[in-house]
């Protein structure tokens, strides 16, 4: 299921366990990942795709092993490509419970198997993170000044946005 990046704050994400975040806006991706980690309140375990692909048995053992102190696991996998789709298929097939997996990818083409799979499945979340445009930057600047309780005109916000590009 596709959820736009600006909709993530308004959507209840607790019912989802698999997320694919892709695109070139790494700062915003990291911000959203931190919000999810804070909501779930569990420690995240970070991997890179090549680590998992080179030793998938070790990865699956870590998924299925339960600790006495932790009930859930949050797994963040960085630099994901289409090669990781087989791993996701296997996780879904094994029906492993109490895990949340966040896949962080760079640009994925429209023909990407992983992207298409996440977009079509209702239980999986796929979110693109594109470069900020003028409107997004203006909204971010406006929100920032509102949080700091600073009164600022629209002209000054526009000037800040123009200078930031």
Q: What spans do the regions from the language model cover?
A:
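Conserved beta/loop motifs at nucleotide-recognition and modification sites
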Residues: 1-165
